[in-house]
Amino acid sequence: MKFNKWTVALAATGVVSLASAVQADESHPVNTALSSTTLSGYVDTSAIWNLGSGHTVANRFANTGSDRQDGFNVNTIKLQLEKPIDEGTWSAGYKVETMFGPDANVMPGALTSGVAIKQGYAALRAPIGNGIDFKIGQFDPIVGYEVTDSYANPNFSRSLGFNNLEPFGHTGILASYQVNDIIGVSAGVANGDSNFGLNGGSLTASGFASGQSGSSMRGMLAESSKVYMGSVVVKAPESAGWLSGSSLYVGAVNGDAKGSKNDPTLLYVGVSLATPIKELSLGASADLLFNGGGTGALGGSYANAYAFYTGYQITEKLKANNRFEYATSGYGAFLPGRTQDKIIGETFTLDYALWSNVLTRGEFRWDRSVDGGANPFDGQKNDLSLTASIVYKF
């Protein structure tokens, strides 16, 4: 074996032995696996000022809940380990995402107060056709314009559809296949106790005691109680000119989210549209949920949420994002204390890249009840807030 001059010099002084150098040079399976593993994550912080006299807000994600108003917040600290799968081979990998902080408490993978496994799955590739990719374990939902990680969204606050209608995650198996450069498909099956937006914040309405987690109720569900999902995505090719990169996404999720009394079906449609103005991007999403066939408190109920997105890159470092929403339901999905509700929402966000690896944003959000019922926001029809968000990514 050939040693470099520094190794020989260290061996001469007794700092290392040539035997240990030989051993260190040998390939070990553990070292080989770790060499392709990446560590990443972020720290998500915010400060929110509610412009009203109270703290009652619309049912959005935890990072803008009533307990985050008028103060400083550490929302999430996330650590991620991942070994991606290789192209074109019988390849294997994995992903583990762990969340720490108050946002973790609402996730389906919550282990204890302030800790959750957001994702934890084995990734497998079968080189059949263009390659079939499998995720086995806990994985993110296949529907939704927005995601749990705030920095990856156009706005800091989440849409009404994200929090109230869409799943936060599934535990099961998901298969994905890229038919060609334009069309991709996926299909999966998961446990029936996975978090589902319809009942995610309303366990009592689904017939179970408040405070019970989905996993604790698995023994109460039928063996056939599963969630089924599928999606199709169509992307415009480079030959489409200025439309290149645009996409149309259609997905559906059906399953017994929290027991046999409810049978929700969610249809999701999302569009991301490039424009002839390269600085301008457009998007839209629709979440349509119907709890057909159920006999419980939510049997036959519906909920719909629509969102329209506009993004404009003002300068190299400054970007503006706007989201307008309209949502309605037959069971009070979006507003506190409602049996039926209608709400409009307007969110405007400025993103300025001041520091490397740091996302710095300021956001104005306005929610207004338009169903004609009692004023839901501490006696007011409107809820307005200002948010400063800083996220460090590594």
Q: Model-found features: residue ranges?
A:
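Detector for outer-membrane/organellar transmembrane beta-barrel domains
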Residues: 230-344
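Outer-membrane beta-barrel "beta-signal"
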Residues: 232, 352-357, 380-394
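Extracytoplasmic loops and strand-loop junctions of Gram-negative outer membrane beta-barrel proteins
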Residues: 59-65, 155-159, 209-216, 251-256, ...
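C-terminal beta-signal and adjacent terminal beta-strands/loops
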Residues: 356-360, 364-379
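Conserved active-site loop/cleft motifs that coordinate metal ions or position small ligands
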Residues: 320-323, 349-351, 357-365
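Gram-negative bacterial Sec-dependent N-terminal signal peptides
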Residues: 1-24
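Outer membrane beta-barrel
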Residues: 26-195, 201, 224-229, 233-240, ...
